[in-house]
Swiss-Prot record:
Tissues expressing the protein: Expressed mostly in vegetative tissues including older parts of the root, cotyledons, leaves and shoot apical meristems (SAM). Present at low levels in pollen, siliques and seeds.
Known function: May be involved in cooperative interactions with calmodulins or calmodulin-like proteins. Recruits calmodulin (CaM) calcium sensor proteins to cortical microtubule arrays, thus being a potential scaffold in cellular signaling and trafficking. Binds to microtubules (MTs) and promotes MT assembly and dynamics to modulate pavement cell (PC) morphogenesis via cellulose deposition-dependent anisotropic cell expansion triggered by cellulose synthase complexes (CSCs). May associate with nucleic acids and regulate gene expression at the transcriptional or post-transcriptional level.
Location of the region described as Calmodulin-binding in the Swiss-Prot/TrEMBL record: 137-151
Ranges of Basic and acidic residues composition bias in the record: 355-371, 412-422
Biased composition (Polar residues): 273-308, 373-387
Recorded superkingdom: Eukaryota
Comp. bias (Low complexity): 310-327
Entries under InterPro entries matching the protein: IQ_motif_EF-hand-BS
Species this protein is from: Arabidopsis thaliana
Protein name: Protein IQ-DOMAIN 5
Length: 422
């Protein structure tokens, strides 16, 4: 009994130690399970440690009991071991099944958690992506507006610059046109140009005197020639050449060069006043009896075309063909009538019959101003109208006209044409 009692005590002590160990393990397992998803029913069982402890206890008991009791102990230990091994196998199976259940539950929880995290993260990512896209759209709109504004400003600036350049170009062209209109393209100094223009003016005056002289002699020759002039007859030489000579005497292309020179010569007409006052009134009466032949020539000028270009110092051959042969006795009163006719013009003064080379030229003209030729076409028209009026007036009215013409002649003493030709 002593050996068996010790064996029982050893077995009881072993069970207590196993219980204490198992309780500690259970506490450890409970703490572990609490930390893992709040689980309470998980149990961990270390089978190898239990087997080692059991074998140690068996060896101790076998050493204590001795050889005498070995047979009885072997039989009893074999039965206990079989029972314990069955319990261990059953516990192992239970633990494996329970652990599989817990693992499957944890796996399901993890899968749900992963799905929840994926949903949350996907929602957050989609929300952040939407915010980013809105920001990008706003930035793109702002950039588009800025670029459109820059393009608009560039176009406005370009249009303004183009308008400014166009206005500047138009202004430059206008200035160049003005310069070209007042520009004298002839070669030579100012004095030479003025001398040439003066020669042309004197030649034009000579041509006018010659035409007036020819017209007076045509009137004195007879009335047949005047009746022939009543219609348009371009076959007659005197008809066309008289108009051409009058047109060449005007010289419209030189008017702009001689205007300034005639203004400068307005101060030199004091000597012309004496000559105009000495003209007798009888000569003025003879002019009033002349027929309206110059009016016929001025009326044809609107129908004739084809200007004839010739030099300023030479006369046309038509003058010689249109002038009839008369006696020297009749030439002197014709010249006097011509002088009266020239003096009675509204825009012309008394003209001298001397050679242009014999006249004295005044050097007081400005070298920078330009010369121009007077428009003799207008003076011829006004002359013809006055001649018609003078032919129709009565003797009483002729006196009034003569007095008015004398007053007008005094006023025209300062006329640049008369001063230049004096």
């Amino acid at each position: 009994m002593g050996a068996s009692g010790r064996w029982i005590k050893a077995l009881v002590g072993f069970t207590k130690s196993d219980k204490s160990r198992s309780s500690k393990k259970d506490e450890n397992v409970k703490v572990a399970t609490k930390s893992r998803f709040g689980r309470k029913n998980s149990v961990d069982f270390d089978f190898e440690k239990f087997q080692d402890g059991f074998e140690d206890s068996n060896t101790r008991s076998m050493v204590d009991t001795g050889v005498s009791t070995s047979t009885s102990l072997q039989s009893y230990g074999g039965v206990a071991y079989d029972e314990q091994s069955r319990e261990n196998r059953a516990a192992t199976r239970i633990q494996t099944a329970y652990r599989g259940f817990l693992a499957r539950r944890a796996l399901r929880a993890l899968k749900g958690l992963v799905r929840l995290q994926a949903l949350v993260r996907g929602h957050a990512v989609r929300k952040q992506a939407a915010v980013t896209l809105r920001c990008m759209q706003a930035l793109v709109r702002v950039q588009a507006r800025v670029r459109a504004r820059r393009v608009r400003l560039a176009l406005e600036l370009e249009s303004e610059t183009s308008q400014q350049t166009l206005q500047q170009q138009l202004a430059d062209e206008a200035r160049v046109r003005e310069i070209e209109e007042g520009w004298c393209d002839s070669i030579g100094s100012v004095e030479q140009i003025q001398a040439k223009l003066l020669k042309r003016q004197e030649a034009a005056a000579k041509r006018e005197r010659a035409m007036a002289y020819a017209l007076t002699h045509q009137w004195q020759a007879g009335t047949r020639l005047l009746s022939a002039h009543s219609g348009f007859q371009p076959d007659k030489n005197n008809w066309g050449w008289n108009w051409l000579e009058r047109w060449m005497a005007v010289r419209p292309w030189e008017n702009r060069f001689l205007d300034s020179n005639l203004r400068d010569d307005a101060k030199l007409g004091e000597n012309g006043m004496e000559q105009s006052e000495n003209v007798p009134k009888t000569q003025i009466k003879s002019v009033s009896k002349m027929p309206n032949t110059s009016n016929l020539v001025s009326g044809v000028s609107s129908q004739m075309t084809g200007p004839c270009q010739s030099d300023g110092d030479s006369s046309s051959p038509g003058i010689s063909s249109s002038i009839p042969v008369v006696s020297k006795a009749k030439s002197k009163p014709a010249k006097d009538d011509l002088a009266v006719e020239v003096n009675s013009r509204p825009g012309a003064g008394p003209r001298s019959h001397s050679n242009p080379k014999e006249r004295s030229r005044e050097p007081n003209r400005s070298s920078k101003e330009r010369l121009s030729l007077p428009n003799s076409g207008k003076s011829l028209g006004s002359q013809s109208t006055k001649a018609n009026r003078a032919g129709k007036l009565t003797p009483a009215s002729q006196k009034v006209v003569e007095e008015k013409s004398a007053q007008n002649q005094r006023r025209r003493n300062s006329d640049p044409i008369k001063q230049r030709l004096a």
